[in-house]
């Protein structure tokens, strides 16, 4: 791999995870806020809210994971090397 | 795309067969002497059965969920056992001439195969339940949706396989990096977090598969 390709790949891998973490971070914050408000209003529904919250967290998390997959492909299975 | 070669991944196939065998032994032990008052293993299996039935019923609907419950249950159990088996069994002790053993779901081939199975089955579910009327789904609210619905058929298996693969691989990598930096005690909580997320990923995989099948068999009016 020539040095310009490897440098670009490393920068792109960092950006893929870093930028990909912004959106899901905001989303998870919003979801957690909603869940806390829900529990404060209705403490008896805590179990149900927690289950739904964790499930939706995992959905949001997978968006960052897509970025991670792209980063891993760039670092370990680079198609342009 | 110069040097992407086709590689057989014997390690993933080997571990998935071992884990499938363990699952088979576990379930046949639990269902050997069935009693009216379930206890021990039978109790656990009945709890699992209830859980999978509820999952399939809420996503697919009362009418056809029975046809698809075995498929959803198999997906859930296989993904769950693969994730946990990869994390809990010390595969590193077994040395192989090439490659290394680990969770079968940390191998992109396994997850793509599972996702394509899901794709095939929701097409089959739609076509067998509604015949050619299944394709009404593509133009359902308006025909403008047609290109997006067709694109969705490709993004569904892509996101399904990458989500599972990425999550399990990320768990393994994070634990690997932490063990490399601090070999003692500190990786343990992260390992528990990994177990937790792998269980949730198995649940998500099964839920989404059931949701796609439910979407295909749903009647539009």
From Swiss-Prot, chain A:
The record marks 61 as: Reversibly protonated during proton transport. Signal peptide: none annotated. It is a multi-pass membrane protein. Keywords: ATP synthesis, CF(0), Hydrogen ion transport, Ion transport, Lipid-binding, Membrane, Thylakoid, Transmembrane, Transmembrane helix, Transport. It holds the Pfam family ATP-synt_C. Gene3D superfamilies: F1F0 ATP synthase subunit C. One of its GO terms (molecular function) is lipid binding. Belongs to the ATPase C chain family. F-type ATPases have 2 components, F(1) - the catalytic core - and F(0) - the membrane proton channel. F(1) has five subunits: alpha(3), beta(3), gamma(1), delta(1), epsilon(1). F(0) has four main subunits: a(1), b(1), b'(1) and c(10-14). The alpha and beta chains form an alternating ring which encloses part of the gamma chain. F(1) is attached to F(0) by a central stalk formed by the gamma and epsilon chains, while a peripheral stalk is formed by the delta, b and b' chains. F(1)F(0) ATP synthase produces ATP from ADP in the presence of a proton or sodium gradient. F-type ATPases consist of two structural domains, F(1) containing the extramembraneous catalytic core and F(0) containing the membrane proton channel, linked together by a central stalk and a peripheral stalk. During catalysis, ATP synthesis in the catalytic domain of F(1) is coupled via a rotary mechanism of the central stalk subunits to proton translocation. This is ATP synthase subunit c. It comes from Prochlorococcus marinus (strain MIT 9301).
